[in-house]
Amino acid sequence: MATIRELRDRIRSVNSTKKITKAQELIATSRITKAQGRVAAAAPYAEEIQRVLERLASASSLDHPMLREREGGKRAAVLVVTSDRGMAGGYNHNVLKKAAELEKLLAESGYEVVRYVTGKKGVDYYKFRAEDVAGAWTGFSQDPDWAATHNVRRHLIDGFTASSEGEAAWREGLNLSEGQDIQGFDQVHVVYTEFISMLTQNPVVHQLLPVEPVIEDEIFEKGEDLLSSSGDVEPDYEFEPDADTLLEALLPQYVSRRLFSIFLEAAAAESASRRNAMKSATDNASELVKDLSRVANQARQAQITQEITEIVGGAGALADSGESD
């Protein structure tokens, strides 16, 4: 059984750890509020560009490379969004597990998977397992901004535009030297953690490209030569220049903004997951301190009882010795 000194040392150690986890919990809570505010601030632009694209789609041929599912596609890009820091519970484990399931499904469908990663934890995970990563970007998982995410957003769009038959431009973060051939791809999937509430965050897969066009909740289906509407939708606007030209200009912006929104949502989910993990750790530390204090008190009581017994026994022995004299 541990001595009283050892128990008290453990109590001090646990209390010290508890202070750290409590501080991390409070920091994560404040970051959630900031992240939610950024997601909310980005929503009006996203809704407006979505509305404009719906109107453009209703007036255009929808014959755009970003809207077409490529028959005989060979390569699929998978972007795995992880965190730069740990102490976030199952945040990274869950998204990496989801990514592995997606990669297996794509491989079974005949695609060559090209993996990209954001977040130091994901980079370290694949490096430890000696698994290939075509590109990695770190340093912005908790507080993504437009400039920091530029290279990953542009590369995924450029790579899809080039297709598996073409080549994309080199960008910082790719695990290739400048000047080497960078083959494109035919699909782009993003695996990230969706923020649902302070207590719930789920890993999800989002197909970023090709974009599935939706006009007022009517999904467009591919015809013989191009995509055609499943319902009759009349355009409400006259476009200058024509709708196809505007769609050509706006679709890359829409995809880029959609990916940035994913980074913002993942940041909120990361902070929420870290807050939950730190709260659980703080609560567990409190319970452990209670248990250790109880054991220490019991040990102290036993020690005092033993000392009293020894004193009483010694006094009795001295009394008996005096009477015999």
Curated annotation (Swiss-Prot):
Compartments it resides in: Cell membrane
GO MF annotation terms: ATP binding; proton-transporting ATP synthase activity, rotational mechanism
Keyword set, alphabetical order: ATP synthesis, Cell membrane, CF(1), Hydrogen ion transport, Ion transport, Membrane, Transport
CDD domains assigned: F1-ATPase_gamma (cd12151)
Membrane topology, record value: Peripheral membrane protein
One GO term of the biological process aspect: proton motive force-driven plasma membrane ATP synthesis
GO CC annotations, alphabetized: plasma membrane; proton-transporting ATP synthase complex
Signal peptide: none
Cited Gene3D superfamilies: 3.40.1380.10, ATP synthase, gamma subunit, helix hairpin domain
Function: Produces ATP from ADP in the presence of a proton gradient across the membrane. The gamma chain is believed to be important in regulating ATPase activity and the flow of protons through the CF(0) complex.
Subunit structure: F-type ATPases have 2 components, CF(1) - the catalytic core - and CF(0) - the membrane proton channel. CF(1) has five subunits: alpha(3), beta(3), gamma(1), delta(1), epsilon(1). CF(0) has three main subunits: a, b and c.
Record NCBIfam families: ATPsyn_F1gamma (TIGR01146), PRK05621.1-2 (NF004145)
Family, similarity comment: Belongs to the ATPase gamma chain family.
Record-given protein name: ATP synthase gamma chain
Species the sequence originates in: Corynebacterium glutamicum (strain R)
Gene: atpG
